[in-house]
């Protein structure tokens, strides 16, 4: 039957209407009340934009797991969530109102700005619900949580205060990835989400040594100048240069180039030849002898720092011999190692900002007209120039100081939201201490079942091993305000005297003010008077990832936890209305999201649960890859390189798309190039054959008594094999083989059971009804629409397949598969010798390795074999009557699993004889039977259990 005749989309819409009118999802939840809980956490999507294939993929995975475990007898709460705060929302508003500076927001008013943010969050709700419902996903939208809701925000305050009380929160200055478009710092895991290959300058810059005798103690020639040579890919940082770092343990060389011995240069000895073909080394000197040497500044704006020890060479072990010149230009305002070494040497105080010429817009704040000792065009100015655009101007200004000027292509981080280059800059921020809990994070990770497992031991473990303190404050407006009030005197915050607020009631008591909303416009003006001192709230808001990482507790309005040493004690001592929800719903049995969340939601969940409960937040996680366009590029609305998901739903149906996605490597963290033909193939191979089964069933009479057919036990055995395989794979959270299992069964059902028994089934299809019903139940988590359509055809007296439980697996012995192999073998020979089925055979000779055992079996199915193969006679012969030869080969697929012993085993296999096979089968040999490929031949014909010879008329 052609797929053009069958409108699967209409079938699905009819089923969807049936679900809605009969409230099937609500009925499932009602019927499962009181069962054991299967806990699922739904990662909240950002409430901006429309759902794409990535959302459909992860939503399909979540829906399948939820439906399946409901059918396994659990109560599964499937509550939707919305991530409402943060950069994604603010960035949309900034674009809408052409906001480029935070002063524009302050002029607009935080209340007006946040009102616009709230509106855009609510804008996409209906579109999201339409897509989620159409894809067949069952979630509770009415009971959904929003991170902007008052109770959720209050719970975030409580969690933050718990961390604060445990000394896990601190304020500090750190080099942070900063989004100049969003005007805020990002966390390290946000910065790692969007790397791109870019071309940047690769230059060697010279710094003139003020007193050459500091380097050459016998220096007497006043005509000679000596320069340190530093390599950089960021010329825009040179105006903030404060020192040059040299490795004290390396050998450096004084040399000249271009036969100009009047200008001497110093750099790492073994790096000179990387940049210069012709050079002459005059002196070799150890790095430690070059430390403390003063040099002339390139720019004169920070000369007042000279008296503090700036603009000298300092020692640092982070200087490597593998790149650059071995001398590192150091700008502590823009480099983590730069800043840390300045703190270590006491050149900067912990609360001091070093020289910095870039503002929050990423633009230069100083004009460069007064450049020292270099004549420049008066038209050149850097004031207001974007930092990445400044490189060309800086290089033009510094042309006399450049002895090497090239380009380099390297990976550079971009803002994950605005897609603009990140600026690494020293910024005051509030942090969660991570470095002192790394080992515990790694320990808790061992308790988690990751699908695929490689994520656990590679990507996530590596990230945890190198995790840095988490920057959780954002100098923004739309978010949960940081619940910290600092002593405030003379318009200056005193960060050593803080009050952390953990609930609405606590804030009401401290301010004597009724609180109805916790957003900035409602609480920024609230002052706390305590012990004669005034406290004012820190203006920052919390990172939205802190909110999503707290959702297991905040979604149920967590507050008032009392913490003891063990998880059970902690949960037993919770003192709040919804305490039982926390205890019953933590940790989650399952979560699932994309690969990028290993540094996002998975990570923040893990950090917060480890600190609060010394426990992982989830037990099992499926990590999916990225759905790309067919050309391998990122899906882009601008490029129009992918079909609209709604068009796919309308053309092929959601079931086909669901099965296409979960049967691909994308469910094991691999990328998928979306191909519409792949969706169409699901119709061709699964849904249309299944539909044809139902068409045949409608032609059958249903008698009250069941008439047993020869293949009933076999098809029931095949169904139970399917049930068992699905149960095993789903218990291991492996989805990508489900389609193959279903295809095997539908092939056996249609092309064997029904075809062979067509006449008998038409007279009584009662047993076929049972098989279709149970198959529909097994498949209902994966293809929810068509499974219910199928179920309702064979079970008109029942409500919905989704109220049924998965059938119990029963081990049923069936001998027909052996006969099936015989029939397939005969068909193969017909095809090989181009003998059509209508050509009747005189006889078929079948050679068996145990004729006595199999003779009765052949007698049982003799009529089936003759009919299926169109032969008049079947002759059985014994293998022992033939001369046979056996070839033993290594099974490299199995041997490659342990490459340490593969050479040794290959040597053993090369010496094996036929006499060794029995011992190998019995397990009394060094070689495992699975490590071999054993081929048997009769008269050069390959033997795989039976030989078949066709005798023609």
UniProtKB/Swiss-Prot annotation:
CC terms in the record's Gene Ontology section: cytosol
What is a biological process (GO) this protein takes part in?
Answer: isoleucyl-tRNA aminoacylation
The primary location reported for this protein is: cytoplasm
One protein family per Pfam = tRNA-synt_1
> What's the Enzyme Commission number for this chain?
6.1.1.5
Where on this chain does ATP bind?
Answer: 637
Q: Name one GO molecular function term.
A: ATP binding
Name used for this protein in its record = Probable isoleucine--tRNA ligase, cytoplasmic
Task: Give the species this sequence originates from.
Answer: Enterocytozoon bieneusi (strain H348)
């Amino acid at each position: 039957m052609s797929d053009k005749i069958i409108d699967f989309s209409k079938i699905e819409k009819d089923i969807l209407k049936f679900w809605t009118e009969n409230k099937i999802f609500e009925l499932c939840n009602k019927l499962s009340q009181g069962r054991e809980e299967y806990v699922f956490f739904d990662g909240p999507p950002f409430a901006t934009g429309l759902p794409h294939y990535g959302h459909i993929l992860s939503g399909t995975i979540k829906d399948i797991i939820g439906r399946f475990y409901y059918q396994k007898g659990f109560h599964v709460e499937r509550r939707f969530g919305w991530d409402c705060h943060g950069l994604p929302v603010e960035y949309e508003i900034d674009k809408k109102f052409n906001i480029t500076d935070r002063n524009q927001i302050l002029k607009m008013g935080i209340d007006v700005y946040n009102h616009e943010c709230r509106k855009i969050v609510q804008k996409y709700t209906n579109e999201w619900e339409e897509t989620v419902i159409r894809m067949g996903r069952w979630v509770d939208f009415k009971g959904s949580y929003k991170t902007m809701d008052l109770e959720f925000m209050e719970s975030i305050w409580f969690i933050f205060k718990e961390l604060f009380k445990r000394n896990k929160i601190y304020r500090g200055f750190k080099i942070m990835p900063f989004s100049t478009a969003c005007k805020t710092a990002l966390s390290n895991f946000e910065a790692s989400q969007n790397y791109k290959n870019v071309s940047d300058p690769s230059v060697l810059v010279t710094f003139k040594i003020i007193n050459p005798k500091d380097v050459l103690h016998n220096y007497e020639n006043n005509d000679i100048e000596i320069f340190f040579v530093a390599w950089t890919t960021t010329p825009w940082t040179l105006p903030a240069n404060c020192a040059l770092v040299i490795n004290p343990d390396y050998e450096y060389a004084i040399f000249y180039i271009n036969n100009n011995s009047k200008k001497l240069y110093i750099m790492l000895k073994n790096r000179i030849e990387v940049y210069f073909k012709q050079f002459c080394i005059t002196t070799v000197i150890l790095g430690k002898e070059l430390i403390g040497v003063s040099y002339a500044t390139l720019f004169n704006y920070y000369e007042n720092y000279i008296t503090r020890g700036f603009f000298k060479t300092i020692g640092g072990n982070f200087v490597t011999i593998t790149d650059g010149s071995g001398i590192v230009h150091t700008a502590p305002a823009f480099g983590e190692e730069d800043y840390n070494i300045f703190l270590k040497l006491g050149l900067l105080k912990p609360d001091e900002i070093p020289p910095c010429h870039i503002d929050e817009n990423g633009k230069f704040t100083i004009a460069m007209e007064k450049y020292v000792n270099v004549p420049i065009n008066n038209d050149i100015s850097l004031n207001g120039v974007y930092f990445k655009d400044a490189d060309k101007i800086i290089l033009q200004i510094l042309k006399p100081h450049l002895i090497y000027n090239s380009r380099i292509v390297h990976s550079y981080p971009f803002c994950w939201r605005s897609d603009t280059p990140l600026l690494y800059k020293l910024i005051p921020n509030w942090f969660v201490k991570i470095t002192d809990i790394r080992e515990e994070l790694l320990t808790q990770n061992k308790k988690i079942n990751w699908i695929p497992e490689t994520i656990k031991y590679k990507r996530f473990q590596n990230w945890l091993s190198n995790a840095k303190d988490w920057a959780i404050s954002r100098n923004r407006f739309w978010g949960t305000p940081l619940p910290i009030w600092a002593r405030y005197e003379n318009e200056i915050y005193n960060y050593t005297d803080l009050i952390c607020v953990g609930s609405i009631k606590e804030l009401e008591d401290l301010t004597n003010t009724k609180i109805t909303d916790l957003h900035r416009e409602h609480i920024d003006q609230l002052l706390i008077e305590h012990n004669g001192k005034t406290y004012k709230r820190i203006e920052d808001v919390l990172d939205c990832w802190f909110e999503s990482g707290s959702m297991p507790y905040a979604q149920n309005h967590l507050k008032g936890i009392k913490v003891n040493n063990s998880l059970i004690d902690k949960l037993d001592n919770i003192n709040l209305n919804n305490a039982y929800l926390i205890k019953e719903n933590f940790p989650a049995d399952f979560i699932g999201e994309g690969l990028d969340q290993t540094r996002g939601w998975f990570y923040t969940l893990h950090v917060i649960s480890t600190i609060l409960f010394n426990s992982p937040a989830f037990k099992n996680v499926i990590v999916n890859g990225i759905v790309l366009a067919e050309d391998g590029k990122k899906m882009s609305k601008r490029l129009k390189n992918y079909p609209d998901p709604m068009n796919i739903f309308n053309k092929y149906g959601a079931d086909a798309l669901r099965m296409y996605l979960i049967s691909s490597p994308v469910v094991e963290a691999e990328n998928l190039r979306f191909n519409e033909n792949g969706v169409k193939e699901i119709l061709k191979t699964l849904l249309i054959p299944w539909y044809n089964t139902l068409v045949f069933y409608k032609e059958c009479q249903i008698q009250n008594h069941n008439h047993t057919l020869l293949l009933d036990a076999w098809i029931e055995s095949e169904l139970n094999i399917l049930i068992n395989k699905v149960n095993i794979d789903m218990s291991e959270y492996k989805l990508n083989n489900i389609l193959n299992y279903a295809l095997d069964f539908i092939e056996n059902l249609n092309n064997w059971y029904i075809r062979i028994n067509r006449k008998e089934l038409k007279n009584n299809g009662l047993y076929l009804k049972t098989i279709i019903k149970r198959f529909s139940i097994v498949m209902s988590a994966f293809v929810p629409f068509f499974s219910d359509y199928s179920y309702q055809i064979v079970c008109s007296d029942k409500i919905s397949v989704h109220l049924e439980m998965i059938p119990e697996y029963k081990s049923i012995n069936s001998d027909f598969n052996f006969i099936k192999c015989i029939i397939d073998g005969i068909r193969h020979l017909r095809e090989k010798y181009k003998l059509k089925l209508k050509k009747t055979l005189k006889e078929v000779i079948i050679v068996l390795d145990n004729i006595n055992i199999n003779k009765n079996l052949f007698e049982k199915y003799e009529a089936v074999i003759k009919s299926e193969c169109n032969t008049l006679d079947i002759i059985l012969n014994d293998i022992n009557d033939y001369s046979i030869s056996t070839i033993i080969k290594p099974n490299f697929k199995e041997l490659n699993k342990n490459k340490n012993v593969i050479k040794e085993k290959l040597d053993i296999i090369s010496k094996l004889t036929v006499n060794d096979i029995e011992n190998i089968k019995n397990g009394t040999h060094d070689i495992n039977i699975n490590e071999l490929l054993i081929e048997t031949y009769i008269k050069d014909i390959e033997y795989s259990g039976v030989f078949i010879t066709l005798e023609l008329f």
